[in-house]
């Protein structure tokens, strides 16, 4: 698994700005108000050919309000889960008691992890001189950087990636299919895994996963080796509910990063909730296969029309994620558990298929004959041919006279046609339009 680098420090020292620079994102909210990054963000990053994950956290502080307590717990959780820590301070505001507390905490409780002490907002030689006072933290080799301008960040990242262990959880290169069991707390993830594997006689091995206390279980189904990434069973160390929720979310994000297909469990009695949608969207945005499993279906009073009505209601709520298949299961009665695994295997098979260019262009010509694109500003979009680009998920490239002439409704039309024609249910894919 990719190493995890956590950015920690008190509020408003520039963690989100550094996060955005490292990941080339603009997703984290950057504001001058202390503590504005209320939640965490995890994004993939790459430096000199080495891939890793970066986590942006809320600020470390001691205020008595609930948000600050939650942010403190999230910071401690992030430090515990991280492989490498970048500890940020602000040269302009000087050394504070919170900085000293964090330094003491890192040296006392997390001295087994690489910690890079970064003095941020150093935009002039004078500020670099003032930054020398930060050696009082006990970190005698500070890195002087400007996350805003980028100065010093490259040298810092060189050191960070050099610290990654050669075997820092790199996934074994094999042909196994990785399925992540994810969902909100108490939707039945543990019951699902126990019911699925409790009577399975083809288990190859159980071994500790790379996410600390998670268990990766290998088993075979119809001749295919499967790695089940289980995110159930939170550790009992979190001191407050917010910490438990944060830890759950962290494990979910890391499981999604590792998997081929995400099996998202929801509670049939509770229905599709906002947090369920966030988890589904997270998997879809990462271009993972997605299968929605409605657990505890045995508790629902039903007739022959119930599942259809239930599905229709969920698809209404899911909006443009209506391409995700739904299955009804019961971990308690073991109903449809292996059917769900088979569906996930089918999704991965479709996700990894490579369609020939000749087949794609026959499809394209038929599509253009039936429904050619409309003109825009008096100009006509002419799509010449298409091909599939090799990637972990399907990526289709269209070569045309001017990509700016493409209208959103026609792009959605092509997406729908491709999904139907190539049976991409549960499979996110990308369309790219290039000028030629």
UniProtKB/Swiss-Prot annotation:
Domain KH-like as annotated: residue spans: 353-436
Biological role: GTPase that plays an essential role in the late steps of ribosome biogenesis.
Name recorded for this polypeptide: GTPase Der
Keywords assigned: GTP-binding, Nucleotide-binding, Repeat, Ribosome biogenesis
Single annotated GO MF: GTP binding
SUPFAM superfamilies attached to this UniProt entry: P-loop containing nucleoside triphosphate hydrolases
Residues the entry annotates as binding GTP 1: 9-16, 56-60, 120-123
EngA-type G domain residues: 3-168, 177-352
Entries under PROSITE patterns matching the protein: G_ENGA
Claim: Disulfide bond is one of the keywords in the record: no
Family, as annotated: Belongs to the TRAFAC class TrmE-Era-EngA-EngB-Septin-like GTPase superfamily. EngA (Der) GTPase family.
One of the GO BP terms on file: ribosome biogenesis
Naturally occurring in which organism (per UniProt): Prosthecochloris aestuarii (strain DSM 271 / SK 413)
HAMAP family assigned: GTPase_Der
InterPro entries named in the record: G_ENGA, GTP-bd, GTPase_Der, KH_dom-like, KH_dom-like_a/b, P-loop_NTPase, Small_GTP-bd
Superkingdom, taxonomy of origin: Bacteria
Complexes and interactors: Associates with the 50S ribosomal subunit.
Gene3D superfamilies, sorted: 3.30.300.20, P-loop containing nucleotide triphosphate hydrolases
CDD domains, per the entry: EngA1, EngA2
Binding-site residues for GTP 2, renumbered to this chain: 183-190, 230-234, 295-298
